Structure formats: structure tokens, C-alpha cells
Amino acid sequence: MGMKISELAKACDVNKETVRYYERKGLIAGPPRNESGYRIYSEETADRVRFIKRMKELDFSLKEIHLLFGVVDQDGERCKDMYAFTVQKTKEIERKVQGLLRIQRLLEELKEKCPDEKAMYTCPIIETLMGGPDK
């Protein structure tokens, strides 16, 4: 049996506006309506919403999720396309990790320079972040 939008949202732990947004973006299909005019969503749609939510938690963009659905919804070159996508996403994650490690090293260095409770205008952390003497 199908679900109304509020039931779908509750089952997937999202809000109704999120469901409508995914529909507008083409991530889920517009559902048929019952005789009362209510949209009735299938369990397959619920699975897609849960998949979208999981991918968002893993920091995938909606554009990337849309691309994944394009591959999943077409049986053709699925494995080849998924491999290429995975390679690209792995490189992107490696770049993000390197960026975060650079930020971490900078913050560790700045923490060592911080004497304690100097006024803000003499704080070496603020000076460095604003492009001051310790660039």
C-alpha cells in the first residue's frame, strides 16, 4: 500500500518539503494521486529517499546523487560508469582531506604561538589569519 507525503517523510526521517524538493529536482518521480487527490508514494520511492539521505550524510551533492541515479536507472554501462565516478569522488575526498590537514597544521602552529590573554590587536593568531607578519 502507498504512503501519503507525511507518511513517506516520517518513514524516511525527512520533512515534507525535502520530499517535494527531491521531486522538483527529479531525484524521485512524481507519484500518482489517489481518488481524493493525495499523492501516493511507493516503497521504492521511500528507498530512493533513504538512499539520497544516506548519500547526503556521506557528503555527496545532489548533483552527484542525480548522476548515481542516472547510472542505476540505466542498466547499460553501469559498472564502468560507477568505477569512473568512484575514482573521481576518491580524488575529491583526498583533496578535501589534504586541505583539512593543512588547516589542522596551521591551527596547531598558531596555538603554539598564542601566549595567553593578550589584547586582540596583539594576538599572533589574529595577526597570522589576517595576513600579518608570520605569513
UniProtKB/Swiss-Prot annotation:
GO terms for biological process: response to mercury ion. PROSITE patterns: HTH_MERR_1, HTH_MERR_2. Homodimer. Mediates the mercuric-dependent induction of mercury resistance operon. In the absence of mercury MerR represses transcription by binding tightly to the mer operator region; when mercury is present the dimeric complex binds a single ion and becomes a potent transcriptional activator, while remaining bound to the mer site. It comes from Staphylococcus aureus. NCBIfam families: MerR (TIGR02051). GO terms for molecular function: DNA binding; DNA-binding transcription factor activity; mercury ion binding. It holds the Pfam family MerR_1. Hg(2+) binds at C79, C114, C123. Keywords: Activator, DNA-binding, Mercuric resistance, Mercury, Metal-binding, Plasmid, Repressor, Transcription, Transcription regulation. Residues 5-24 bind DNA. InterPro entries: DNA-bd_dom_put_sf, MerR, MerR-type_HTH_dom, MerR_fam. Residues 1-71 form the HTH merR-type domain. This is Mercuric resistance operon regulatory protein.
